[in-house]
């Protein structure tokens, strides 16, 4: 069973009361028309940067454009995409696969939130379903270049984990937990966990990592952390509008043992 499916089992026990209610309306702060403008800007910016990248004639020029694209994607995710998804109800089943924030009648699971956010920021995925239904570490490996490192931290408190993440450097990361996956943003000496939470309040949240129930619940099994948009491969794929190859189709039986993600 993948993290996506295992999460649903725990979700029923932890937030049954919350999930018994219908999907809530989009918060007043979410403006669908404004978000469409954000998505259009992402497309236009990727097209403009991609054209410049294709025309660049030196390695130095290409590196500068990659860095410009990297900054744009990360800042767009943090300042535009993540805020738009806040409050979207978490859930399971075929209604948990929303592609845009606050789609009427829809929920969002942890891995489908991760893939939707990446797609909203202009990243093309070979198969959203295969990404979203794979174990967390498979998702991370697919987003990393060949040989890219997944940092494994075992039995650390949330405070200790935050210290390790801050030591890795500011930026965006993917974290796999025992039955969960999400984003981590490291800025100004602190780490924030952005995810579709299977713990209360049962919505997409941006919370301090040190106070996250989902982080605490994974302490015994550990945490798997990988950098996102910090290597040239994924930035080049974004610039060229080329798909990130998907993980293999997951057909195994999920196990919570360390490394099984």
Question: How should these model regions be labeled?
Answer:
Residues 1-2, 25:
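Initiator methionine at the very start of the polypeptide chain
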Residues 2-11:
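Bacterial N-terminal signal peptides that target proteins for export
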Residues 20-22:
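N-terminal signal peptide c-region/cleavage motif recognized by signal peptidases
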Residues 133-206:
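...with weaker cross-activation on analogous glycine-rich loops/strands in unrelated enzymes
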């Amino acid at each position: 069973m993948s993290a996506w499916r295992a999460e649903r089992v725990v979700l029923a026990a932890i937030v049954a009361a919350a999930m018994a209610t219908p999907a809530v309306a989009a918060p007043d702060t979410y403006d669908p028309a404004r978000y469409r403008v954000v998505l259009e800007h992402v497309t236009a910016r990727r097209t403009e940067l991609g054209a410049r990248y294709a025309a660049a004639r030196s390695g130095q020029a290409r590196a500068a454009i990659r860095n410009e694209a990297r900054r744009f994607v990360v800042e767009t995710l943090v300042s535009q995409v993540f805020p738009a998804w806040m409050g979207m109800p978490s859930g399971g089943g075929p209604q948990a696969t929303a592609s845009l924030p606050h789609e009427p009648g829809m929920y969002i699971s942890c891995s489908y939130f991760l893939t939707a956010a990446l797609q909203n920021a202009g990243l093309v995925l070979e198969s959203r379903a295969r990404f979203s239904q794979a174990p967390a570490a498979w998702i991370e490996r697919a987003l990393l270049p060949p040989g890219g490192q997944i940092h494994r931290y075992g039995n650390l408190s949330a405070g200790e984990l935050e210290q390790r993440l801050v030591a890795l450097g500011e930026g965006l990361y993917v974290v796999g937990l025992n039955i969960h996956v999400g984003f981590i943003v490291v800025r100004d000496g602190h780490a924030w966990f952005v995810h579709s939470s299977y713990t209360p309040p049962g919505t997409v949240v941006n919370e301090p990592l040190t106070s996250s129930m989902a982080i605490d619940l994974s302490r015994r099994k550990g945490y798997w952390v990988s950098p996102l948009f910090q290597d040239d491969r994924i930035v080049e794929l974004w610039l060229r509008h080329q798909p990130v190859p998907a993980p293999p189709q997951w057909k195994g039986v999920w196990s919570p043992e360390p490394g099984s993600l």
